[in-house]
């Protein structure tokens, strides 16, 4: 718009990460790392309960102290949300703080219900996506207050609609959250995975997306090799243009033996893609997950595997990794990486899926 002054600037993810690390360092001057959970590059949770008496400050004064320190050392304006639990702190920042002059939102269970039970849209709330919002709207539920009322009148219906996720939906409708900072810090997954996902910049056709699926699998396999890991299965998730309101496609394929072999994994994942993806709907998101990854260890070949061919492929993988490490990720590519629909070269210049 002509009447608004603004700057058009390219995103610089590497710079953002450097500033994020600096700001985290500022927080460590006041709060121990055990009481901080980094949620994203620009957001973290802090349990400051035991620090209020130490610094002789109220919760709001503590937030202001941290915000002032960030401003003084980086020139960046911070925003804070204060809540009696993690969920309320998040909502206080996401919804309340942006409408307050000092950028500090505050909520407890009662004020949450008073201020936000009628708030719209529902997708403003943490963990409620547009699809969940549309699903609820189909039954006349448009606010958190509506969800709270439904939990009293027909809780079984919510569980039938959303399964185990209904428990979290109901808790959040009432402003409750059972997870504490200690739970986050003590949580360790029994199974580990490695994933590669991206949002496409336009609708991709079935064949164009097949090229991207092969590229992403190739990158995932080399990541496994570089880390000395193998997997026994891969999950593929495909999401479509939201205007078609089509459910995402999802499938998992298992390998006869744990593997990180490029040809085996690329061909198998492409076959899975061609089996589960809708060839007639524009594709916008792709995610590939290597499940139950474990350290590679000693590789024992079966009677049905060509050990010489496998060793040759492994030497090729290691050579590719060495070239990329020395000369850059785009120093060596497959021919398909030069296709117009390829995202390989652009993503190699990104950090965490964002422009570096």
Predicted segments, located by residue:
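Gly/Gly-Pro- and Ser/Thr-rich, intrinsically disordered tail segments characteristic of DNA damage-repair
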Residues: 1-171, 308-356
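Short, functionally important structural connectors and interaction interfaces within domains
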Residues: 33, 96-99, 108, 114-120, ...
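Short, charged/polar, Gly/Pro-enriched secondary-structure boundary elements
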Residues: 52-55, 244-245, 294-299
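A glycine-rich phosphate-binding loop feature that marks nucleotide/adenosyl-phosphate handling sites
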Residues: 84-87, 171-174, 230-241, 283-294, ...
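DNA-contacting surface of Y-family translesion DNA polymerases
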Residues: 124, 134-280
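Acidic, metal-coordinating catalytic segment for phosphate/diphosphate chemistry
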Residues: 250-251, 255-356
């Amino acid at each position: 718009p002509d009447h608004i002054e603004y700057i058009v600037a390219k995103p610089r993810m590497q710079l953002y990460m450097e500033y994020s690390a600096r700001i985290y360092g500022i927080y460590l001057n006041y709060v121990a790392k055990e009481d901080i959970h980094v949620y994203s590059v620009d957001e973290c949770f802090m349990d400051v309960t035991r620090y209020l008496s130490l610094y002789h400050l109220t919760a709001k004064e503590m937030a202001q102290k941290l915000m002032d320190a960030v401003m003084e050392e980086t020139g960046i304006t911070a925003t804070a949300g204060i809540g009696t639990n993690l969920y309320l702190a998040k909502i206080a920042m996401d919804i309340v703080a942006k409408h307050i002059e000092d950028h500090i939102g505050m909520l407890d269970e009662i004020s949450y219900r008073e201020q936000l039970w009628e708030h719209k849209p529902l997708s403003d709330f943490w963990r409620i996506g547009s699809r969940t919002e549309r699903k609820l709207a189909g039954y006349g539920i448009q606010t958190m207050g509506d969800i709270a009322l439904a939990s009293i009148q027909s809780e079984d219906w919510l569980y039938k609609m959303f399964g185990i996720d209904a428990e979290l939906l109901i808790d959040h409708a009432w402003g409750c959250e059972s997870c504490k900072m200690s739970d986050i810090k003590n949580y360790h997954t029994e199974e580990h995975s490695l994933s590669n996902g991206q949002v496409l910049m336009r609708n991709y056709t079935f064949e164009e997306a097949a090229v991207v699926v092969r590229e992403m699998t190739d990158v995932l396999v080399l990541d496994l090799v570089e880390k000395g890991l193998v997997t026994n299965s891969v999950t593929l998730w495909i999401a479509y243009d939201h205007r078609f309101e089509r459910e995402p496609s999802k499938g998992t394929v298992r390998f006869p033996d744990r593997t990180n072999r490029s040809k085996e994994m690329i061909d198998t994942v492409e076959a899975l893609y061609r089996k589960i993806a809708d060839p007639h709907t524009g594709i916008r998101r792709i995610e590939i997950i290597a499940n139950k990854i474990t350290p590679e260890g000693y590789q024992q070949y079966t009677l049905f595997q060509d050990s010489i061919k496998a060793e040759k492929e492994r030497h090729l993988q290691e050579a590719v990794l060495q070239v990329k490490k020395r000369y850059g990720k785009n120093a060596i590519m497959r021919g398909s990486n030069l296709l117009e629909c390829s995202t390989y070269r652009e993503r190699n210049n990104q950090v965490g899926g964002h422009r570096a």
